[in-house]
Amino acid sequence: TQNNQTVESTPEATAQVEFKDFGPEPFVFDIEAYTTQNETYRTSIWTGTYMQMTVMSIPAGGDIGAEMHPDIDQFLRVEAGSGVVMMGDEENNMDFEARVEHDFAVFIPAGKWHNLINDSDEPLKVYSIYSPVEHPHSTIHQTQAEGIAAHETEHAIEHGH
């Protein structure tokens, strides 16, 4: 900690990645180390008032699952692995398709249906930035099923169900 700010920048710090939500405090870190060392489906690393960053590990043959965020723009960056990103105006008609691999970035506009599919034989490691925030502070989803269940619960609460 320097001047009450968390700093992760040395090789020693990189080896000691701590998976927790550091927001909304200032935070500097090795984003590639956090992304590639993450073993969970989704973990929030920083949650602020208007933006959130998560790391994800999508297993070989897995995917994020078709989803759409009506009021959230999303940015994805691939740090390891490869796959296919699909987008479209309807869940059953995602007519935009592109291959992604290490160092590729994806911008997903609010209101677009999308899915990221890992068609390789190794985990697909990505980080995601949401604006505004999509998941509660300190979110950790060990598996996709856990992420889907939490999403359904969060949105049921938001809509008074």
Task: Identify the residue ranges that each predicted region occupies.
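Glycine- and acidic-residue-biased ligand/ion/polar-headgroup-sensing regions
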Residues: 71-89
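A short, N-terminal "cap"/entry segment at the start of jelly-roll beta-barrel domains
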Residues: 1-52, 65, 98, 142-161
